[in-house]
Every structure is written in C-alpha cells, then in structure tokens.
C-alpha cells in the first residue's frame, strides 16, 4: 500500500496532536513539519522528522494539514494549492465558510488539487450529524450547544489582540444554541484592561455572543482543553411529529480536531479537484483500507 505523505503546517496545540494521529495512522507517513522557527530549538518528538520554515523545502508532499490560526488559513491554503498539493484545515468562522469554499475552490481547480475546509469537529464532524438529522426529520429545529469547555479558535483570537499576554476562552452553553463566552486573560504591561476587554468583545469571534472578560494572575492555572457538545433535533419525519434525536460527546478539543484533520487528509486523496466541506465528502472516504470491507463491517 502506497502511503500518503502529509506535511504538518504549524506546530501549536493542534499540530502536536496531528503528529500523534499521523503516527497512529497505518496509511500515512510524515513528510515533515513546517514551523516559523524551522529546525531551531525543535521539540524532541520531532527529531526523526524534517522540520523546515517553508513547505517548498519538503519532498513529495501529497497533502498539507494546516494547523495555523483560522485567519491565516486562506493565505497558506492558496500558496500550497498553487503548488498542486492538497490542503485540509479546521477553519472555524462559520459565517466565512461559503466565501472561503468559493475562493479555494477556484484555486484548487486551477492547479489540479483538493482542499477540504472547516474540518474540525464543529464545523466538521458535527456538521455531518446535523445534515443527517435534517435529512431524516426535514421539518424541525436543531440546537447545537457547545461546552462547557475551552474554545481553541476563540482562545487563539484573543491571544492575537494587542495587550494580551495569555488567554483562555471558555464556551458556556445557556441552552437552545445560545452561548456565553468567558474570557480569562493575563495583561501585558502598559495596557489598560478596559481597552483590551473592549477590543475582545468587538472581535468577530465574540461580537454576537454574551461575553465576559476577566483579568487573572495565571491563565495556566485555569487551563483545561476539555470540551463537548450536546446536539438535539426535534422534528417531523414524513407527517409524523415528535421525532427526537440527541448526540452528545465530551472530548479533548485539539486531539479530536487533529484526528478529524487526518481523516479528511485521507479523503482528499479520493476527491476530484476542488474545494469541499465535510458534508460533501462520502463518509466512507474518511476511513483507511478496503471500501467493501468497511461496507460489510458497518452496514
């Protein structure tokens, strides 16, 4: 079996877990890791791998797994797709997904590559669950309640705001798909808390939610990467009312995001050039090995 050569682009929380997921996958080999510092002061777990500053320094890359902040995804994806290399990412600004799909779709088709976007657990695997529930109960209401837990995307967004030394953004469900954002920050010297808090609340990640910003002496003392979701739908199948569905999970956020990214990296090798979200990709393409064996096992 020819293995898929994957490059990890970005080596923060998600990148570290992508490394573990690739090491555990029977059909992948790690082409290398791209990080801003290159091989300088590289962590011990990367000693066996090529560590570079630019993906152009790696050989024979089939797919790049983007573990960068969401707001950097489009830039990196376009550069890599233009090289004819597939990309996958966990872009998580829901309102920007349609536009990103259009932008990367044109680039991917031009260069004969595949991009699968917004492939974390939400958006991502939860999107598949929502799609299935809507199909089997076409009329009704779905509520997605996140947490309580640490939001990776929101935390990264806070860290990027001027004056923030360290940050943790917690998502607290209040019910019926409405959430409260609890943001804990350490402040850099010379900045006013009120001004930094206002900048956080006006960011696109927070502007539509009830958001509370708290200054703390140590973010590390609060840190827990656990998260979860409760997803429910109450609707109608045919003409029959009161069909109720519920999906729950409690997870380590970056570990699950990483596993989903590796699954869609595999699936990217089976699609025609273009840009896809997870609801457009056959779920069986997420799995390694023989398709008929999976059909016999799962169906």
From Swiss-Prot:
Homodimer. GO terms for biological process: diaminopimelate biosynthetic process; lysine biosynthetic process via diaminopimelate. It comes from Bacteroides fragilis (strain ATCC 25285 / DSM 2151 / CCUG 4856 / JCM 11019 / LMG 10263 / NCTC 9343 / Onslow / VPI 2553 / EN-2). NADP(+) binds at residues 11-14, 36, 67-70, 90-92, 119-123. Its EC number is 1.4.1.16. Optimum temperature is 37 degrees Celsius. Belongs to the diaminopimelate dehydrogenase family. Transmembrane segments: none annotated. One of its GO terms (molecular function) is diaminopimelate dehydrogenase activity. This is Meso-diaminopimelate D-dehydrogenase. Substrate binds at residues 92, 122, 146, 152-153, 171, 181, 227, 253. Pathway: Amino-acid biosynthesis; L-lysine biosynthesis via DAP pathway; DL-2,6-diaminopimelate from (S)-tetrahydrodipicolinate: step 1/1. It holds the Pfam family DAPDH_C. Keywords: Amino-acid biosynthesis, Diaminopimelate biosynthesis, Lysine biosynthesis, NADP, Oxidoreductase. Induction: Is expressed at a very high level and is reciprocally regulated with dapL and dapF. It catalyses: meso-2,6-diaminopimelate + NADP(+) + H2O = (S)-2-amino-6-oxoheptanedioate + NH4(+) + NADPH + H(+). Probably plays a role in lysine biosynthesis. Can use NAD(+) only very poorly since the activity observed in the presence of NAD(+) is about 14% of that with NADP(+).
């Amino acid at each position: 079996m020819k293995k898929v050569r994957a490059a990890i682009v970005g080596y923060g929380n998600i990148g570290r877990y992508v490394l573990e997921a690739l090491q555990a996958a029977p059909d992948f080999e790690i082409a290398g890791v791209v990080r801003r510092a290159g091989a300088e002061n590289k962590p011990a777990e990367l000693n066996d791998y090529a560590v570079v500053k630019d993906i152009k320094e790696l050989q024979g890359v089939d797919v790049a797994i983007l573990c960068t902040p969401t707001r950097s995804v489009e830039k990196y994806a376009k550069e890599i797709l233009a090289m004819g290399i597939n990309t996958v990412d966990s872009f998580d600004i829901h309102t920007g997904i349609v536009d990103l799909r259009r932008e990367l779709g044109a680039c991917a088709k031009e260069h004969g590559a595949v991009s699968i976007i917004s492939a974390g657990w939400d958006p991502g695997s939860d999107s598949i669950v929502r799609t299935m529930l809507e199909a089997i109960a076409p009329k009704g209401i779905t509520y997605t309640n996140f947490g309580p837990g640490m939001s990776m995307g929101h935390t990264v967004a806070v860290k990027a705001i001027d004056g923030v030394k360290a940050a943790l953004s917690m998502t607290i469900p209040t019910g019926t798909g409405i959430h409260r954002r609890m943001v804990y920050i350490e402040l850099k010297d010379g900045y006013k808390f009120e001004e930094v808090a206002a900048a956080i609340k006006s960011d696109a990640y927070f502007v539509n939610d009830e958001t509370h910003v708290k200054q703390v002496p140590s973010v590390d003392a609060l840190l827990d990467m656990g998260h979860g979701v409760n997803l429910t739908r109450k609707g109608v199948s045919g003409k029959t009312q009161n069909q109720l569905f519920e999906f729950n999970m409690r997870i380590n956020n970056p570990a699950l995001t990483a596993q989903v990214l590796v699954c869609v990296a595999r699936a990217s090798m089976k699609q025609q050039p273009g840009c896809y979200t997870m609801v457009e990709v056959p779920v069986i393409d997420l799995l390694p090995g023989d398709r008929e064996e999976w059909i016999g096992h799962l169906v």
